[in-house]
Amino acid sequence: MICIPIIDNTVEKALISAKEALKYGDIVEFRLDLLDNLTKFDIEKFAKIPSIITIRANWEGGAWKESNNKRIEFLKHAIKHGAKFIDVELKEEKNLELVTYRNEIGSKTKIIVSYHDFEKTPEINELIDVVEKELKIGDIAKFATFSNSKKDVLKILEVMNKYPGDIIAIGMGESGKLTRILGLRFGSILTFASMKGKSSAPGQIDVTKLKEILNLIE
């Protein structure tokens, strides 16, 4: 599965971008923390589209400036209205509250629990510890760490390979591009690619180019 991040700053632009992106990818990620004047009604629109709903906290590299309680309520609203996936941080104290709410209302939303390190890739045992903690909370574990070397790439791929079908793992940065290309073969449920000029993280590959590469190595 190829996921294309939507990083526009208005609801109208985001919906237009998503329609275009789904011509190339299988799913989109709505970065709702980047939007101006987000409402629950807007979330209902986004939840109807095959997507990951992400409202990234500012303490995890995101742009959310309002209260955390409002952020959690918006994520619950996405669950209530049938979003395919939501993404919540491992460090978010209320992540289990979202899982409990999902279970109570019988929603089919899958919950991705995520971890980010924008400077380095931790050692394998640390990454495994992160993934195990995430899987005790949600349905899918995700980590995105900055890859500074080929060794970091190998660490990421090795951990991916231990959790096929239950993980999304990404090496950010130039050397991490290999994880975006090989991730699907090593067990990641999806890989991220960008529309031209709209990257949400360092090292993201243009979706057209990524599809060409994936076709070559199939």
Curated annotation (Swiss-Prot):
Binding, 3-dehydroquinate: E29, F30, R31, R56, R180, S200, Q204
Keywords assigned: Amino-acid biosynthesis, Aromatic amino acid biosynthesis, Lyase, Schiff base
GO biological process, one term: aromatic amino acid family biosynthetic process
PROSITE patterns, per database record: DEHYDROQUINASE_I (PS01028)
InterPro entries linked: 3-dehydroquinate_DH_AS, Aldolase_TIM, DHquinase_I, Type-I_3-dehydroquinase
Keyword Lyase: yes
Pathway participation: Metabolic intermediate biosynthesis; chorismate biosynthesis; chorismate from D-erythrose 4-phosphate and phosphoenolpyruvate: step 3/7
EC code(s) of this entry: 4.2.1.10
Catalytic reactions of this protein: 3-dehydroquinate = 3-dehydroshikimate + H2O
Domain of life of the organism encoding this protein: Archaea
Active site: H116 (proton donor/acceptor), K142 (schiff-base intermediate with substrate)
A GO molecular function held by the record: 3-dehydroquinate dehydratase activity
Secretion signal span: none
Similarity annotation: Belongs to the type-I 3-dehydroquinase family.
Role, per record: Involved in the third step of the chorismate pathway, which leads to the biosynthesis of aromatic amino acids. Catalyzes the cis-dehydration of 3-dehydroquinate (DHQ) and introduces the first double bond of the aromatic ring to yield 3-dehydroshikimate.
Subunit and interaction comment: Homodimer.
Protein's recorded name: 3-dehydroquinate dehydratase
This protein's encoding gene: aroD
